[in-house]
């Protein structure tokens, strides 16, 4: 990364690590992902949004679910932060950011799963998986390790 890029801010966002009452994790598969590639819900923060506003806007946009359907378990101290590759930085968000910085929030879904509607055209699938199966689904470089830190921090006593 050149010196000009290193002075730019990170684009902030949120990752929603959602578990259900059976301690299964909600994963989504975006269009364009390989069959083995999955992720948690989330997205970038809009100008002036708080972390919580960002979180619940993304959940509403992506799964049509409202705030009363969730209990926040915690916000991890482990952020996911990365720089865009130098050949990509100008193509993403007009070169305004050097990379992304995501807060990881763990939530329990307490609503009715039958009412979840995956509204975005970004997804080709979703599933609920147990903690023991996360590593085989979170296959992007360092993805499992990054999320595992938040899960261990906030859920270790819950998912034993």
Predicted feature residues:
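Charged phosphate-binding loop/patch that engages nucleotide di/tri-phosphates or the phosphate backbone
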Residues: 136-160
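Anionic group-transfer/hydrolysis microenvironments
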Residues: 22, 31, 132
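A conserved beta-turn-beta hairpin within the catalytic core of GNAT-like acetyltransferases
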Residues: 33-36
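Unchanged
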Residues: 45-142
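Conserved N-terminal beta-strand and adjoining loop/helix that marks the start
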Residues: 2-25, 41-47
